[in-house]
Every structure is written in structure tokens, then in C-alpha cells.
Regions:
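Bacterial N-terminal signal peptides that target proteins for export
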Residues: 1-11
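Bacterial N-terminal signal peptides
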Residues: 9-20
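Signal peptide processing junction and immediate N-terminal pro/mature segment
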Residues: 22-24
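A short beta-strand-turn-helix
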Residues: 26-43, 71
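Structural alpha/beta surface segment adjacent to cysteine/selenocysteine redox centers
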Residues: 41, 49-132, 137, 207
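Soluble periplasmic/extracytoplasmic beta-strand elements of cell-envelope proteins
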Residues: 44-47, 78-81, 171-173, 189
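Acidic/histidine-rich, surface-exposed loop or edge segments in extracytoplasmic proteins
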Residues: 46-51, 184
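C-terminal cap of thioredoxin/glutaredoxin-like
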Residues: 62, 129-208
Length: 208
């Protein structure tokens, strides 16, 4: 792990503009349906990701279930998903919109699971079928999806990821929930789909 003031990184990757982001409130968590875990969990884990990203899918299949059971469902970590579309248009953007539209009906995580379970083989023509399968109001979902609601918010997520210094997906930030990163308690960047053990090591250190 490498320390850079208010920020630490693992895997030897240096990230920039971190103190400025913390001072500007970057990484602030809002209750928009993309949060798993207790609001008062001591640690917050942010993921910046794309539903079409192969390494993001690897995290979903191999690491996410273990983090969910050991840390999130036990109240130790609050998990927040952020969109980081790899292009300005196309299936990645459409998948992010579909998930947000599901979230508007309180069903973000079932759509998240469905999209990542497709292992990158996504087709926007199937999204309305996914909406039906997870019990959404189909007309409301179709209107939201067809009007491309949430695009501005999706791109804001990507801008936030860039300010943390990420240039690819997935990227993760670990920080204390109360107070955010400080010089004494810096945030931790975990770039890429690193093994579960890397997450566990950093989380356990912060919880100690």
C-alpha cells in the first residue's frame, strides 16, 4: 500500500486530486437505491463500474458474494454502486439507465444482479423483459428507459471517478463512513478486480 496524504492506494497505482475531491464533498453518499448495508456501518465501499466490463463481472461473480456475506450483511460495511460507463453511448449506458429506472421503483439490486449475471452479453431489447421478471411496473420502466432518464447523474458518477483518479473499471474506494477521508484516516483506492483477500485485508485493518 502506498500513502499519498489523504489517500492510500494498493496494487502500486497512484491517484491524483484526492484532497480537493474530499474537500468538495466528492464521494458523498445519497440514498438513491444504490446502497447496500447499514447506514451507520463504520466503513463505506464505493464501486465505480460498468455492466459491460469483464473485470467488473469478475468482481461480481468472485468477490462480491463474499464481501456481501462477511461485511455488508453483518453491518460492518456499507456498499455504494457508482456508474462508470466506458463510452458516451451504447449498451453500457443503456444498462446503467435500466438499473437506475429499476431503482426508481425500489428494485435496483435485482436489476444489478440480472445485468451482471448476463456476463457482458447484454441486449437493450431484453431490458423490458428483465423489468417484468423482477416485478417492475412495466409501463413506468419503459417510459423511464425510453426517455433516458438519469443520464446526467450517470455521467456525474464517471466524473467523480475521474476526480478520484480512476481511468478504467472497476475502481473501488474504501473510507470511513463518518467524516470521510482525512490525513489521519485516508481513503484507500483499490483499482481493478483484485482478489477478495485484498479487500478483506484493508477492511479488517480499518475495523481494527
Amino acid at each position: 500500500m502506498m500513502s499519498t496524504g489523504w489517500f492510500c492506494t494498493v496494487a502500486g497505482v497512484s491517484l491524483l486530486a484526492l484532497v480537493q475531491l474530499a474537500e468538495a464533498g466528492g464521494g458523498a453518499v445519497t440514498d438513491d437505491g444504490r446502497i447496500r448495508g447499514r447506514a451507520d456501518a463504520p466503513i463505506t465501499l464505493l464501486e465505480y463500474s460498468d455492466f459491460t466490463c469483464g473485470y467488473c463481472g469478475k468482481f461480481f461473480r468472485e468477490t462480491w458474494p463474499r464481501l456481501l456475506s462477511k461485511y455488508i450483511e453483518t453491518g460492518k460495511v456499507r456498499f455504494v454502486y457508482r456508474d462508470y460507463p466506458r463510452s458516451d453511448q451504447g449498451i453500457g449506458i443503456e444498462a446503467a439507465v435500466a438499473a437506475r429506472c429499476a431503482g426508481a421503483q425500489g428494485r435496483y439490486w435485482p436489476m444489478y444482479d440480472r445485468l451482471f449475471s448476463e456476463r457482458g452479453r447484454l441486449d437493450s431489447g431484453l431490458f423490458k423483459g428483465y423489468a417484468k421478471a423482477i416485478g417492475l411496473d412495466e409501463a413506468a420502466f419503459a417510459k423511464c428507459f425510453d426517455e433516458r432518464e438519469y443520464l446526467e447523474s450517470i455521467f456525474r458518477d464517471r466524473q467523480e471517478a475521474n476526480r478520484w483518479g480512476f481511468r478504467g473499471t472497476p475502481g473501488f474506494i474504501l473510507m470511513r463512513t463518518a467524516g470521510g477521508p482525512t490525513e489521519k484516516e485516508p481513503a484507500i483506492a483499490i483499482p481493478g478486480a483484485v482478489p477478495y483477500e485484498d479487500f478483506a485485508e484493508e477492511i479488517d485493518r480499518m475495523l481494527a
